Regions:
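A detector for short, charged/polar N-terminal pre-domain segments
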Residues: 1-5, 69-71
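Short basic helix-loop element that most often maps to the first helix and adjoining turn
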Residues: 5-24, 49, 75-76
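Conserved hydrophobic/aromatic packing and binding residues within compact polymer-binding modules
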Residues: 7, 21-22, 32-35, 61
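Recognition helix of helix-turn-helix/homeodomain-like DNA-binding domains
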Residues: 26-41
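DNA major-groove recognition helix of helix-turn-helix
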Residues: 36, 54, 65
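DNA major-groove recognition helix of helix-turn-helix/homeodomain DNA-binding modules
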Residues: 45-60
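Short, charged recognition helix plus adjacent turn
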Residues: 62-77
Length: 77
């Protein structure tokens, strides 16, 4: 799944509008819509804010596979 699909799913699961999320991030609704359609990449500052808001990891929001995260941790050990 792509980041923009995950982002939209998280918002819809919580019955939030694009306008509500745009207001939360202090951006315009059009810019937020672009995040959800994949037209614009999400800046890191907004990625962090969204992860905290939704209670998910950046890996999850970015659509990275779980085994990739584990391999990365093992490589650092």
């Amino acid at each position: 799944m792509e980041t923009y699909e995950i982002l939209r799913g998280l918002r819809e699961d919580r019955d939030l509008t694009q306008q509500e999320m745009a207001d939360f991030l202090k951006i315009g609704r059009t810019m937020y819509r672009r995040y959800e359609t994949g037209e614009t990449e999400i800046p890191i500052r907004h990625l962090k804010t969204l992860c905290v808001f939704y209670g998910v990891s950046a890996d999850y929001l970015l659509g990275l596979p779980d085994n990739l995260s584990r391999r990365s941790k093992n490589a650092r050990a």
